[in-house]
């Protein structure tokens, strides 16, 4: 019976009777995420693409391992003393402070207002980085070698969740079991968009067997630019809201950020062929004329001036479920 190997970066099934000392190619280290770069602590290769990170071939050979790594156990908090409910209640008067209501109360502008391109401010660090890239882009001969139809032995399959490598002509007839969706990491949970088997353990996520069968993809055929996720966050002051998108070497001539009083559309092209897109229905109202974008070598900052100096409960306006309930109540 074939068993699943739980070595990091492997995820293949193996026969215990034929398991040898060099049957498994895996990563003995741990995954490392730093400044939008992803890699393994045991090797030097880094990438910003999560799918490319998952397809990094292991750097160590050894035996397949069928033992599932233990998940991190949360510490159990126990108390030896039994206290009455009256003792557990706080001995002070509680004050519940509600978040400010959305700005719809002050006549929220229509989302159909015309969009305006925000001013782009390009930093000196980005200009220097782009100049260096232009000089290095002259060496296109190395890229031409990658465009050849010849597949090298040991090339890893580019399909998500597949860890098979090219061994020869027999690999062309082999069935590929892979994930047709994209990897998603949200609030500590990791899963594929195509099957949504969620887990908080990274090793378990890497070992998830694919949900789709097809042919291996030994070479990437990029039809132009591809949309990829980017790490981004936001913060606010009394008068401004700032969104930071961590995309390196963005191209100002191909990027744009447009907005009206309540909507924000972000389109960033970075690292030559990658795109990041985000459409945000803003929680509050902004002053478009006093808002701008700062582009640096490591990130893009979108600074939006608030129309009123008030705290936003969140960046995006939540779905209007309450409004739908109110409509149902009035019709009853």
Curated annotation (Swiss-Prot):
Zn(2+) 3 binds at residues 157, 162, 176, 216. Keywords: Acetylation, Chaperone, Metal-binding, Phosphoprotein, Repeat, Stress response, Zinc. Residues 65-316 are annotated as: Interaction with HSP90AA1 and HSP90AB1. Zn(2+) 1 binds at residues 5, 10, 24, 64. The keyword Phosphoprotein applies. Residues 62-81 are annotated as: Disordered. The gene is CHORDC1. Residues 5-64, 157-216 form the CHORD domain. InterPro entries: CHORD_dom (IPR007051), CHRD1 (IPR039790), CS_dom (IPR007052), HSP20-like_chaperone (IPR008978). It comes from Pongo abelii. Zn(2+) 4 binds at residues 179, 194-195, 211. SUPFAM superfamilies: HSP20-like chaperones. The modification Phosphothreonine is found at residue 47. GO terms for biological process: chaperone-mediated protein folding; regulation of cellular response to heat; regulation of centrosome duplication. The keyword Phosphoprotein applies. Transmembrane segments: none annotated. Coiled coil: none annotated. Regulates centrosome duplication, probably by inhibiting the kinase activity of ROCK2. Proposed to act as co-chaperone for HSP90. May play a role in the regulation of NOD1 via a HSP90 chaperone complex. In vitro, has intrinsic chaperone activity. This function may be achieved by inhibiting association of ROCK2 with NPM1. Plays a role in ensuring the localization of the tyrosine kinase receptor EGFR to the plasma membrane, and thus ensures the subsequent regulation of EGFR activity and EGF-induced actin cytoskeleton remodeling. Involved in stress response. Prevents tumorigenesis. This is Cysteine and histidine-rich domain-containing protein 1. Zn(2+) 2 binds at residues 27, 42-43, 59. Interacts with HSP90AA1, HSP90AB1, PPP5C, ROCK1 and ROCK2. The modification Phosphoserine is found at residue 51. Residues 227-316 form the CS domain. The modification N-acetylalanine is found at residue 2.
């Amino acid at each position: 019976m074939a068993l699943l190997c739980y070595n990091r970066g492997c995820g293949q099934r193996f026969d215990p009777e034929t398991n040898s000392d060099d049957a498994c190619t895996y990563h003995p280290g741990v995954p490392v995420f730093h400044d939008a770069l992803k890699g393994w602590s045991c090797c030097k290769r880094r990438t910003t693409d999560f799918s490319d990170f998952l397809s990094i071939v292991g750097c160590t050979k050894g035996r397949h391992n069928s033992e599932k790594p233990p998940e991190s156990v949360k510490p159990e908090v126990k108390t030896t003393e039994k206290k009455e409910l009256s003792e557990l209640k706080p001995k002070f008067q509680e004050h519940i402070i509600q978040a400010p209501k959305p700005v719809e109360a002050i006549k929220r502008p229509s989302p159909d207002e015309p969009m305006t391109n925000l001013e782009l401010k390009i930093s000196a660090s980005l200009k220097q980085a782009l100049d260096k890239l232009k000089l290095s882009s002259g060496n296109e001969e190395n890229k031409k070698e990658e465009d050849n139809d010849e597949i090298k032995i040991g090339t890893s399959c580019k399909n998500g969740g597949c860890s098979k490598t090219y061994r020869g002509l027999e690999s062309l007839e082999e069935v590929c079991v892979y994930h047709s969706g994209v990897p998603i990491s949200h609030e500590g949970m990791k899963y594929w968009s195509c099957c949504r088997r969620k887990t908080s353990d990274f090793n378990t996520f890497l070992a998830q067997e694919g949900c789709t069968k097809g042919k291996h993809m030994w070479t990437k055929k990029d039809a132009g630019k591809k949309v990829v996720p980017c790490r981004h966050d936001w913060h606010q002051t009394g008068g401004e809201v700032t969104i930071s998108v961590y995309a390196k070497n963005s191209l100002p001539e191909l990027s744009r950020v447009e907005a009206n009083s309540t909507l924000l559309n972000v389109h960033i092209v970075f690292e030559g062929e990658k795109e990041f897109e985000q459409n945000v229905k803003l929680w509050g109202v902004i002053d478009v004329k006093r808002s701008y974008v700062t582009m640096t070598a490591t990130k893009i900052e979108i600074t939006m001036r608030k129309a009123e100096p008030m705290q936003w409960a969140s960046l995006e306006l939540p779905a209007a479920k309450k409004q739908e309930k109110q409509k149902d109540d009035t019709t009853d």
